[in-house]
Design a protein with these regions (language model features):
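Thiamine diphosphate
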Residues: 9-22, 28
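Acidic, glycine-rich active-site loops and adjacent beta-strand->loop/helix elements
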Residues: 1, 33-42, 46, 188-190, ...
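Glycine- and aromatic-enriched mobile tails/lids
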Residues: 63-94, 104-107, 159, 165-184, ...
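Flavin (primarily FAD) binding-site architecture
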Residues: 1-8
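Short, glycine/acidic-rich beta->alpha junctions
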Residues: 9-14, 43, 199-200, 206
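Short hydrophobic core segments
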Residues: 1, 21, 182-184
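Short loop/turn microsegments at loop-to-beta-strand junctions
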Residues: 57-58, 160-162
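An anion/pyrophosphate-binding glycine-rich loop and adjacent beta-alpha core
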Residues: 20, 26-152, 208, 217-220
Length: 257
C-alpha cells in the first residue's frame, strides 16, 4: 500500500511478507490486482480514512470543484444531474466501487486535480449526523461540516488481492505444490477466492476461516510427527544477487512526472 500516494494501509504495508516468501521459493500471483476504495478523505495533514460508500447510497453526489461551483450558483437543488459520473455510468455516483474509483481517477487526470468533491449539503443534516456519527466526527477534526461543506475525496489503495499463493489450509505453494512449514494468512495471501476485486467484509474469511484451517493443520501435523523433519526439508533462502539490488523509484514520484 505504501507504494501509492493515497492508501488506507498502515505505514508497515511495504510488501515485506511477499518478498520473504518469494525468496523462500513460494509462488507469487495476481499482484496486479489491487482494490481501490473510491472515496478516501483527501488531506495533506492526515492519513487518508475511508468515507463510507453508504454515504453515496444515502444520496451524496460526486462532483468536480467546477461542477460544484456552477451548481451552487444555479441555486442548488439535486446535484446528481450535474455530476461528472454521468459521463461514465448511467447510475452516476451509485455505481459499484470499481466503476466509481476508475471514473474518479480518470476525471482527476483529465482536469489535473488532486481530488474531487463528495457533496452532501442537499441532504438533511440532522439525518446525516444520526446515520454517520463517526464520519461526522472525523470530518469535524478536519474542519469539514457534514451536510454543509463538500468533502474532498480521492481513490485510495485499500486491499492487495494478490500475494503468496496458498492452498485451502493457507500453506504457501511452490511450483503448484504446498511448501512444508510456510503459511500465509490475511492480506499477504492470494487465496483465489476474490477474483480481481475484493469480496466485501472479507476479514471473516481471510483472517478467521483460513487461520482456523491453518492452525488445525499445523496441530495435526505436529501430533502425527510430520513436523520432526521440517528443518531439513526447508528450501534454502534465495539471496543471490542481493548486493546488486538497486532501490526502485516508487509510484509516488512517477505520478508527479
Amino acid at each position: 500500500g505504501m507504494m501509492h500516494r493515497s492508501t488506507t494501509n498502515p505505514s508497515i504495508a511495504t510488501g515485506d511478507g511477499v518478498a520473504m516468501a518469494s525468496r523462500a521459493g513460494a509462488d507469487i500471483k495476481d499482484m496486479e490486482f489491487i482494490q481501490f476504495h473510491p472515496t478516501a478523505l483527501y488531506s495533506s495533514s492526515v492519513k487518508p480514512f475511508l468515507i463510507t460508500e453508504a454515504l453515496r447510497g444515502h444520496g451524496a453526489v460526486l462532483m468536480t470543484m467546477e461542477e460544484h461551483s456552477k451548481w451552487r450558483m444555479s441555486g442548488g437543488g439535486n446535484p446528481s444531474s450535474e455530476s461528472f459520473m454521468l459521463n461514465y455510468s448511467t447510475k452516476g455516483s451509485l455505481d459499484t466501487r470499481d466503476v466509481v474509483a476508475r471514473a474518479i481517477d480518470t476525471e482527476m487526470k483529465r482536469i489535473g486535480a488532486m481530488n474531487v468533491l463528495l457533496v452532501t449539503e442537499h441532504l438533511d443534516k440532522d439525518e446525516l449526523l444520526h446515520s454517520f456519527p463517526t464520519i461526522a466526527e472525523r470530518l469535524d477534526d478536519e474542519g469539514i461540516e457534514l451536510g454543509k461543506d463538500p468533502i474532498p475525496v480521492t481513490p485510495a489503495a485499500h486491499y492487495m488481492v494478490g500475494g503468496v499463493s496458498v492452498d485451502e489450509f493457507g500453506r504457501a505453494m511452490s511450483d503448484g505444490r504446498p511448501m512444508q512449514g510456510l503459511y500465509a494468512i490475511g492480506e499477504v495471501a492470494r487465496t483465489g477466492l476474490h477474483g480481481a476485486n475484493r469480496l466485501a467484509s472479507n476479514s471473516l474469511l481471510e483472517a478467521v476461516v483460513y487461520s482456523g484451517r491453518a492452525s488445525r493443520k499445523i496441530i495435526g501435523d505436529w501430533r502425527s510427527g510430520e513436523l520432526s523433519s521440517l528443518e531439513s526439508g526447508l528450501p534454502r533462502w534465495r539471496s543471490e544477487d542481493l548486493s546488486q539490488l538497486v532501490e526502485n523509484i516508487p509510484l509516488i514520484p512517477d505520478l508527479d512526472a
